[in-house]
Swiss-Prot record:
Top-level taxonomic group: Bacteria
Alphabetized UniProt keyword annotations: Aminoacyl-tRNA synthetase, ATP-binding, Cytoplasm, Ligase, Nucleotide-binding, Protein biosynthesis
Name assigned to this protein: Glutamate--tRNA ligase
GO cellular component, one term: cytosol
Family: Belongs to the class-I aminoacyl-tRNA synthetase family. Glutamate--tRNA ligase type 1 subfamily.
Source species taxonomy: Bacteria, Bacillati, Actinomycetota, Actinomycetes, Micrococcales
GO molecular function, one term: glutamate-tRNA ligase activity
Keyword Transferase: no
Binding site for ATP: K256
Motif 'HIGH' region in this chain: 9-19
Pfam families with a match to the protein in the record: Anticodon_2, tRNA-synt_1c
Length: 491
């Protein structure tokens, strides 16, 4: 049987990294097995669902390059793929399961269930115990005469229910640990516990890979599957695999209130798809015990849901950034340069359309910072000074505080030496040789003392791309203007 997996989020809020990790594992398993990845939307909660959130989920998957074979936006043989558009399908199946006796009417309210338990000397919170399974027609008519409408419950088997979880192994829910459950509200609206397995059955889903938080609903859904098999709707129960929680700081479950839970928070900071996909994959799976950095293709080739670790995975921001930096360094330099542009524009370093001169500067500068950043969001601070004029370079407070007592002497000697370098020879090798001779050999300055003030003068920062290469990019006139400006400011 060909593998068919699905990702079926509710469009509420911004995409959460745990949600996207679930999509990623489903996508990877489909690609590894040559199966199909379905993308379905569970939008039956009108009060919470939004088109904005729907658009963000689409944006997230496309940004991470997680393509789908069937589903919203692309169509397929089981359309529609939004639950809000499948009401007639659910009504037909509800009628079928009611006629077969798998679903029955239940009029008891929550208060009446509690009163029933108290009358039997039990904990009132024990829940429903199937006491309305066999209401007579007269009892139903009496309830309706009072203006009451029934919920519909699924009749569950009175036996142990076991399944082999792909991540956690054999799991058994003993008979009586779960009771007949509501599948349709009194207002005739079907619940998630009904529509989710029904859609999986109708769409031929073979493997349900989802979060650990849904483990407790699995026996109910398997019971529904048995009813669907007995009524000829499907022929099999899918395999289930429950993925581990994603934890945040302090070993607490990552909450939507935590900034790092928001996928777009990471994109805005400058994660690239390759880096973030790599790190999200590590939240429960690994390629090997001694290798954390790998390509998407390598992950797909090796991914097996049976290798997922059932223990909670902690989102480690520093490790995520480090892995992202490794992937930045794997990019072709031209690709890296192009990816920095949105961040440079957002920071006001560049204004679109980018000029040919600016592109030339970026092409020269990109290799200098590609080895030094972990996030694309760091590039405006590293490159901004190369696109500014001397008068607009602001000296940062920590950079000014780092200047040694003899900074003025170093600047003056540098200006004098660099003025003698011919324009035709203005390249980083000649610049470095000239400054080392003037400051290190002649004045006896240590390199850190000699070159630190020059870095501050050029960039306004203590940390910048390589000094001599930066001077070469800026050109002789602009370099001297910046050195003179700081020298004058120091008096």
């Amino acid at each position: 049987m060909d593998v068919r997996v699905r990702f079926c989020p509710s469009p509420t809020g911004t995409p959460h990294v745990g949600m996207i990790r679930t999509a990623l594992f489903n996508w990877a398993y489909a690609r590894h097995t040559g199966g199909k990845f379905l993308f379905r939307i569970e939008d039956t909660d009108a009060a919470r669902d939004s088109e904005e959130s729907y658009g963000q989920i689409i944006d997230a998957l496309r940004w991470l390059r997680l393509d789908w074979d069937e589903g919203v936006e692309v169509g397929g043989p089981h359309a529609p793929y939004r639950q809000s558009q499948r009401s007639s399908i659910y009504r037909e199946l509800i009628e079928k399961l009611t006629a077969s006796g798998h679903i029955y009417e239940s009029f008891a309210t929550g208060e009446e269930v509690e009163a029933h338990n108290i009358a039997l000397g039990r904990d009132p919170k024990l829940g429903y115990d199937n006491f309305e399974r066999d209401l007579t027609d007269a009892q139903k008519a009496a309830h309706r005469a009072e203006g009451r409408e029934p919920a519909l419950r699924l009749r569950v088997p009175d036996e142990d229910l076991s399944f082999d979880d792909l991540v956690r192994g054999e799991i058994t829910f003993s008979a009586g640990s779960f009771s007949d459950f509501v599948v349709v509200r009194p207002n005739r609206q079907p619940l998630y516990t009904f529509v989710n397995p029904v859609d999986d059955a109708l769409m031929g889903v073979t493997h349900v890979l989802r979060g650990e938080d849904l483990l407790s609903s699995t026996p109910r859904q398997i019971a529904l599957y048995h009813a669907l098999i007995e009524t000829g709707v499907t022929t099999f129960v899918p395999r289930f695999g429950h993925l581990p929680y994603v934890m945040g700081e302090g070993n607490k479950k990552l909450s939507k209130r935590d900034p790092e839970s928001n996928l777009f928070h990471h994109r805005d900071r400058g994660f690239i798809p390759e880096g973030l996909v790599n790190y999200l994959t590590l939240l429960g799976w690994s390629l090997s015990h001694d290798r954390d950095v790998f390509s998407i293709d390598e992950m797909v080739a090796a991914f097996d849901v049976g290798d997922v670790n059932p223990n909670p995975a902690r989102f480690d921001q520093k490790k995520a950034e480090s892995i992202n930096g490794d992937h930045i360094r794997l990019l072709e330099v031209g690709d890296f340069a192009e990816r920095t542009i949105p961040y440079l524009v957002a920071a006001g370093v560049l204004t679109e359309p980018i000029t040919e001169t600016q592109r030339a500067v970026l092409a020269e500068a990109a290799p200098l910072v590609q080895e030094r950043v972990q996030l694309l969001g760091e590039t405006p601070g590293m490159l901004g000074f190369l696109f500014a004029e001397a008068a607009s370079v602001t000296i940062e407070d920590d950079a000014r505080a780092s200047l040694p007592a003899n900074a003025g002497e170093a600047l003056a000697a540098s200006i004098g030496a660099l003025e003698l370098v011919p324009e035709a020879e203005w390249a980083h090798e000649a610049i470095e040789a000239t400054l080392r001779d003037a400051l290190v050999e002649t004045l006896g300055f240590k390199p850190r003392i000699a070159f630190g003030p020059l870095r501050v003068a050029l960039s306004g920062r203590r940390v910048s791309p390589p000094l001599f290469e930066s001077m070469a990019i800026l050109g002789k006139a602009e370099t001297l203007a910046r050195l003179v400006r700081l020298s004058a400011a120091l008096g």
